[in-house]
Each structure stands twice: as C-alpha cells, then as structure tokens.
A protein has these predicted regions:
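Charged, low-complexity intrinsically disordered terminal regions and linker tails
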Residues: 1-14, 18-22, 49-153
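Short pre-active-site segment immediately N-terminal to the catalytic Zn-binding motif
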Residues: 23-27
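Short, basic amphipathic alpha-helical segments that act as recognition/interaction helices
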Residues: 28-55
C-alpha cells in the first residue's frame, strides 16, 4: 500500500495554502482528510478525473482518520472502473488503484474550489457557495440512492 494520498504541487501551493491561511471552514492542517474528501466530492460531481502532475503527499495512509474512508475509495473505484468489467472484481482489493482514482477526482475538485475562490473573492460569498455545493451534493446523493441524509428535506 502506498504511504500517502497525493495532491498536485499546484494545489498545495495554491488553493490549499489559501484555505490554510484563512482557516476556511476549519479545514486546517489537522483535518486534511476532510478537505481531501470535500474536493473528492466536488470532483465526482464534476464527473471528470484529472491526472496529477508533479504531486506531493497530502495524507499519510497510516493516519487513523483516513482509514474509515478506504471502503468509500474502493466503492468509487468499483463504480467508476470495475463495474464496467466485473470479471476484474478481484481488483477491488487493489487499494493503490483506488487511491490513484480518488486522487484524480480530488484533483478536479481542487480545480473547482480554485475557480470558486477566484470568482467569489468575498469570504462570506465563498462560504455560502461552498455550503450550497455541500447541500446540493447531499441532495443529489439522497435522490440517486433513495436514502435520507442529514440535509434531506
């Protein structure tokens, strides 16, 4: 198993640094997993994975706060890759391939965050936009899978 989940250097030095400096939504250095998963959700909503170029470690895979998400990362890997060819189902145990895929979707999500931050320089408007996106992702999930979630009306 790889030792880190990676993000691009561009994002580390760009949007992630900006969010760290503003301590936006409490996504500080102690909650890297939350920030990564939020970017992942935005990337999945966008629908296009973006390959990482010049990446660095962002989350150590041995951290306890990321381990509960391994099943989620494998589920995404199954949904996006393995479901098209179920004879490869044994590859579901290949966590490194799952990490690579979620890194690509999170990479897209960080681009989405960067664009939002650029378009909404006002911190309050940016915060409202982020909360709106979280709500929309939650509603889409609820509708798609027929489950009630925290924000389901």
């Amino acid at each position: 198993m790889k030792s880190t989940i990676n993000v691009t250097t561009e994002h580390l030095e760009g949007i992630i640094k900006e969010l760290d400096e503003s301590n936006f939504y409490n996504l500080s250095k102690t909650s890297r997993t939350d920030l990564f998963n939020f970017a992942l959700a935005l990337g999945l909503k966008d629908g296009t994975p973006t390959k990482l170029i010049s990446s660095k470690g962002f989350i150590r895979t041995e951290n306890e706060d990321v381990k509960p998400y391994f099943f989620l990362y494998k589920s995404i890997y199954y949904d996006k890759i393995l479901s098209e060819n179920e004879k490869d189902i044994d590859k579901i145990t290949d966590i490194d391939s799952a990490f690579e895929l979620v890194e690509q979707y999170a990479n897209t999500g960080f681009y989405v965050l960067s664009r939002m931050k650029k378009d909404l320089a006002n911190e309050e408007l940016f915060t409202k936009k982020i909360l709106y996106e979280i709500n929309m992702i939650d509603k889409d999930y609820s509708k798609k899978y027929g489950v009630k979630t925290l924000y389901t009306e």
